[in-house]
Amino acid sequence: MAKRYLLDFEKPLVELEKQIEQIKELARDSEVDVSQQLLQLETLAARRREEIFKSLTPAQKIQVARHPQRPSTLDFVQMFCDDWIELHGDRNGGDDMALIGGIGSINNRPVLMLGHQKGRDTKENVVRNFGMAKPGGYRKALRLMQHANRFALPILTFIDTPGAYAGLKAEEQGQGEAIARNLREMFGLKVPIVATVIGEGGSGGALGIGVADRLLMFEHSVYTVASPEACASILWRDAAKAPEAASALKITGNDLLKLGIIDEVLPEPSGGNNWAPLDAGNTLKEAIEKHLNALLQMPEDQLIEERYKKFRILGKFIEANNIEEIYSEIPQKTE
């Protein structure tokens, strides 16, 4: 098993993890029965881990969402189905490895699954561009979704990106147009779409595959209009203000559920999905099946209409004749 990567707020667990590893090594190298000591330490570590994760700040949740050992799109695909076939290319000369897709089956139901894919190490992240898709990735995703629409396959998307790639070449190739086209076309697809934020849901890069009938989110995932670091740099000219920005942006599942942005928050194992990937996979699979079963009962016209309404009602604005009227509508901070 790969060595566990502990986040900075998990440091109280470091010593316990060392003791657990030492006892496991002792058990491997000798015939001494250490099962009781091992059970006590693992129970203590689990209890402390649960206490830590019950009170995470939004900034700490971002660290969990970005954890290098957090289950990825491919991990969930492998958990869900044995016969997944990856489909490649945007039919315009590109095959973006940061956004992958293919056809598989869940409980004998054929589906299209696509999502952002990060790497586990530096070499993989270079190949996957750290999960930041280029225009070709979104065009590939649209091609696959249109294929699913043609053959009446439900669409499952997995969102895990800091944002769409913002390099000069991507802009020259029409990054904004590619994402905008996906948004427009997804509203008209006649098949159910269930999207899940499995890690980071960053800006337009997430929205490019996020127009869905149901939007799910793991409890330690984040979904945001801009990264807290970028927001802090814009508002305060100081990236160190990222924790404050994270709180103000309302990026957590519970906040977004209250705001009506998402439809369900999925619980994670103690310590996050990286501690028990199979448990996370079972939770997600059950949720997807529940929502798909409900959506498949809807007529196509109703499905499209409700998808449109779901996004049309998001957000609000204040209209007034002058600035004083606007300020009078905003709750004032009390001392």
Swiss-Prot record:
The keyword Nucleotide-binding applies. Component of the acetyl coenzyme A carboxylase (ACC) complex. First, biotin carboxylase catalyzes the carboxylation of biotin on its carrier protein (BCCP) and then the CO(2) group is transferred by the carboxyltransferase to acetyl-CoA to form malonyl-CoA. Belongs to the AccA family. It is found in: Cytoplasm. This is Acetyl-coenzyme A carboxylase carboxyl transferase subunit alpha. Acetyl-CoA carboxylase is a heterohexamer composed of biotin carboxyl carrier protein (AccB), biotin carboxylase (AccC) and two subunits each of ACCase subunit alpha (AccA) and ACCase subunit beta (AccD). Residues 40-294 form the CoA carboxyltransferase C-terminal domain. Keywords: ATP-binding, Cytoplasm, Fatty acid biosynthesis, Fatty acid metabolism, Lipid biosynthesis, Lipid metabolism, Nucleotide-binding, Transferase. Pfam families: ACCA. It comes from the Bacteria. GO terms for biological process: fatty acid biosynthetic process; malonyl-CoA biosynthetic process.
